[in-house]
Amino acid sequence: MKPHFRNTVERMYRGTFFYNFNNRPILSRRNTVWLCYEVKTRGPSMPTWGAKIFRGQLYPEAKDHPEMKFLHWFRKWRQLHRDQEYEVTWYVSWSPCTRCANSVATFLAEDPKVTLTIFVARLYYFWKPDYQEALRILCQKRGGPHATMKIMNYNEFQHCWNEFVDGQGKPFKPRKNLPKHYTLLHATLGELLRHVMDPGTFTSNFNNKPWVSGQRETYLCYKVERSHNDTWVLLNQHRGFLRNQAPDRHGFPKGRHAELCFLDLIPFWKLDDQQYRVTCFTSWSPCFSCAQKMAKFISKKKHVSLCIFAARIYDDQGRRQEGLRTLHRDGAKIAVMXYSEFKHCWDTFVDHQGRPFQPWDGLDEHSQALSGRLRAILQNQGN
């Protein structure tokens, strides 16, 4: 039996979609929340029997929020369909507020036959600790039911355009900064939910053998510390990892290196004028262009010091050597990762599930050899 839908919208106007699903991280005057949803029965064919839109306001009572409207409707309908398993997907213009996140977490705990994936265009009050904690509770994986939350990227915006927008036959045209904003929001959500790296991803990409093949990605793990009473205090809210963005005709046509994604992220933190130390652990040392831009950043931000530990040196010939020298000359500390840095990354950024770091054969020897090469590069100021 098909469900009876109330308080829903069949399709939204194109202007409504572009205005409300703008993924610019900081926006004002977006007080209406749009929630597009799909409900599928879990099984081999997984037919979609519900695909509609709820709309609500940010500031009235929580019962007026679209998440609460959906839960009210779905709970009533589920009373007649308790035995069926469902997969629910939301596409929302704002991530849930604290009360909605708590209500959704309670709903999932009460109804383990329902799985929920939430794609969000923007993060609501992501800098407030109570909002951060509510989303962590909603998405925690401690063996119980939880939601999966992701940032909308091109494919999700395209899907919403096709399924929920009265496009009048016109194709979806993404905003120019959609991929850059996605990268910022994706990294911020990773910080907020404390995402960790798969162990295989870490050991494959951070292996410090001097010659490797097939590893085109760069991973960058980072942490931020603030000076307080002559000691460095770790800021847990600014800790995570990034990787380079592959070339994408819908996003970055030429791709975007992890270091540049990281530089995009730092202003988003809105650091004050106190002294900060930023430490990066990278699978490859920066290329010439990235090194130059990182050097420009620290030369302008005198209150931010930068430490870079690289697992390997990226093609250290010619201009790339000069890029590292410029970065070093402008005040960055550059070093090769040794056992202690690999172990720290494993303990801090990897989903190790209690397993200790196991060094691979030749780790120390490779680290010593790479350190010698790096010293030669940095000391060769005349070339």
From Swiss-Prot:
Residues 29-138, 214-327 form the CMP/dCMP-type deaminase domain. One of its GO terms (biological process) is DNA cytosine deamination. It catalyses: a 2'-deoxycytidine in single-stranded DNA + H2O + H(+) = a 2'-deoxyuridine in single-stranded DNA + NH4(+). InterPro entries: APOBEC/CMP_deaminase_Zn-bd (IPR016192), APOBEC_Cyt_Deaminase (IPR050610), CMP_dCMP_dom (IPR002125), Cytidine_deaminase-like (IPR016193). Signal peptide: none annotated. The modification Phosphothreonine is found at T32, T218. Residues 213-215, 312-319 are annotated as: Interaction with DNA. PANTHER family: DNA DC-DU-EDITING ENZYME APOBEC-3G, MRNA EDITING ENZYME. Homodimer. Homooligomer. Can bind RNA to form ribonucleoprotein complexes of high-molecular-mass (HMM) or low-molecular-mass (LMM). HMM is inactive and heterogeneous in protein composition because of binding nonselectively to cellular RNAs, which in turn are associated with variety of cellular proteins. The LMM form which is enzymatically active has few or no RNAs associated. Its ability to form homooligomer is distinct from its ability to assemble into HMM. Interacts with APOBEC3B, APOBEC3F, MOV10, AGO2, EIF4E, EIF4ENIF1, DCP2 and DDX6 in an RNA-dependent manner. Belongs to the cytidine and deoxycytidylate deaminase family. This is DNA dC->dU-editing enzyme APOBEC-3G.
